[in-house]
């Protein structure tokens, strides 16, 4: 609903990614069909990294996917949906890698403010750069090295 209330610049397309057993999946699909912007709802995807690389902005929880978004330099408005996400949210916001929002209204307010001030591209670029600097994206190699497995 928040995105539908904002006059987004350009020709935005909205992609919502959910788990295949998400309790609100059907309700979200129904709402996507009534959005003023073209919207699709995907469930149980196997190409999340690709979806992230073609996105300009993510709105998502400060859980484990937050690190994937950082690895790809994807600007993010993050929500804390569980207690164990609080420290991640604080750390990412302190690093300038994500901005924490508490409610859908706050999402709409932030976007409206950026658009009104013609700041969208600058804010997203800054968030993306900071996000990319949080992780080097070579975690697999680090784990392999720590396990003492020789390179192939």
Residues covered by each model-derived region:
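Nucleotide-activated sugar donor-binding and catalytic core shared by glycosyltransferases
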Residues: 1-152
């Amino acid at each position: 609903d928040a995105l539908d209330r904002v006059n987004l610049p350009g020709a935005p397309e909205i992609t919502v990614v959910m788990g295949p057993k998400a309790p609100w999946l059907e309700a979200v699909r129904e709402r996507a069909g009534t959005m003023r912007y073209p919207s699709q709802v995907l469930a149980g995807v196997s190409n999340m990294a690709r979806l992230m690389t073609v996105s300009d902005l993510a709105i998502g929880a400060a859980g484990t996917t937050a690190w994937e978004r950082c690895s790809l330099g994807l600007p993010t408005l993050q929500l804390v949906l569980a207690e164990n996400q609080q420290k991640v949210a604080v750390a990412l916001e302190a690093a300038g890698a994500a901005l924490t929002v508490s409610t859908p209204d706050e999402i709409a307010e932030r976007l409206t403010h950026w658009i009104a001030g013609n700041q969208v591209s600058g804010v997203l670029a800054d968030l993306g750069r900071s996000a990319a600097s949080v992780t080097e994206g070579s975690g697999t190699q680090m784990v392999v090295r720590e396990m003492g497995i020789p390179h192939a």
